């Protein structure tokens, strides 16, 4: 829905829509510099790839005034690095679903993951951490499929888990489908990811569940690192860092070093 929103906004405002030749940070950087792009909409994963690849240093991206991100949870570490790499750009979080369309929200600050819903036509509530929406634009149903999260009274269960603060501001935690069940204990991948991102040398993280004979699942991780230490060393480093910060069942039991994090065609982390 984010791509459609960007395209329609360009049509409505008479703006020029620039499409990079390939889905790569290098191609995006070249397109931004060549066409002096003002607005950069992208997923957090792709924005992190741009940071890791040094795209901002290779190309003049000073014309970027707004970076709009969404489609998946944004790691705090990536958001903070973006703010430093693009000091003159406004970082705007976006939210929407194919079933409801985009929802008008406002980020609390450039380096804050919290936002508030400012759409007067949208009702919202949080049920067991899951965000529910009711909008005039909600779809009626699916062709040749069950109604899934579409409720008869007009509500839509988004499948997005959120944290809500005392001021009714929301923060996306992750997808309900990505929660790892370790012997009956629920583990949010984003919580583990945030702790691992505190470790110097870890550039990107993917947390997922791996089958285990006794607990059913165990927490596993793939990491992109800047050093040349092996998986065994990093596993020890991760366990030492997580001890006291995470419950024992949330600490990754499997650590795999990879060159890049697996993403889907929409440049979002692959949910396993």
Residue ranges and their predicted role:
Residues 1-49, 66, 92:
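AMP-binding/adenylate-forming
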Residues 26-29, 56-58, 193-194:
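Short hydrophobic/charged patches on amphipathic alpha-helices used for structural packing
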Residues 40, 96, 135, 161-250:
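AMP-binding/adenylate-forming catalytic core of the ANL superfamily
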Residues 45, 72-73, 137:
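Alpha-helix/helix-capping structural signal
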Residues 92-99, 116-119, 208-210, 256:
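Beta-strand->loop->alpha-helix junctions that form or flank phosphate-binding loops
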Residues 125-153, 185-187:
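Conserved ATP/PPi-binding loop(s) of AMP-dependent carboxylate-activating enzymes
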């Amino acid at each position: 829905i984010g791509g459609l929103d960007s395209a329609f906004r360009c049509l409505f405002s008479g703006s020029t829509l620039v499409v990079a030749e390939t889905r790569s940070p290098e191609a995006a950087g070249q397109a931004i510099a060549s066409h002096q792009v003002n607005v950069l909409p992208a997923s957090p994963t792709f924005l992190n790839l741009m940071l890791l690849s040094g795209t901002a240093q290779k190309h003049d991206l000073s014309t970027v005034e707004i970076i709009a991100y969404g489609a998946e949870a944004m790691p705090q570490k990536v958001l903070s690095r973006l703010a430093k790499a693009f000091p003159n750009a406004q970082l705007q979080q976006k939210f929407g679903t194919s079933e409801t369309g985009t929802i008008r929200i406002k980020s609390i600050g450039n380096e804050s993951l919290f936002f508030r819903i400012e759409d007067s036509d949208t009702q919202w509530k949080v049920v067991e951490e899951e965000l529910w929406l009711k909008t005039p634009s909600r779809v009626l149903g699916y062709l040749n499929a069950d109604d899934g999260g579409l409720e008869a009274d007009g509500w839509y269960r988004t499948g997005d888990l959120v944290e809500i603060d005392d001021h009714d501001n929301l923060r996306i935690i992750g997808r309900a489908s990505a929660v790892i069940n370790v012997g009956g204990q629920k583990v949010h991948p984003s919580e583990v990811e945030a702790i691992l991102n505190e470790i110097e040398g870890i550039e990107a993280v993917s947390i997922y569940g791996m089958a285990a004979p006794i607990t059913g699942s165990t927490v596993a991780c793939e990491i992109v690192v800047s050093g040349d230490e092996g998986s065994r060393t990093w596993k020890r480093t991760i366990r030492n860092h997580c001890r006291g910060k995470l419950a024992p069942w949330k600490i990754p039991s499997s650590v795999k070093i990879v060159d890049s994090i697996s993403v889907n065609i929409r440049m979002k982390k692959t949910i396993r």
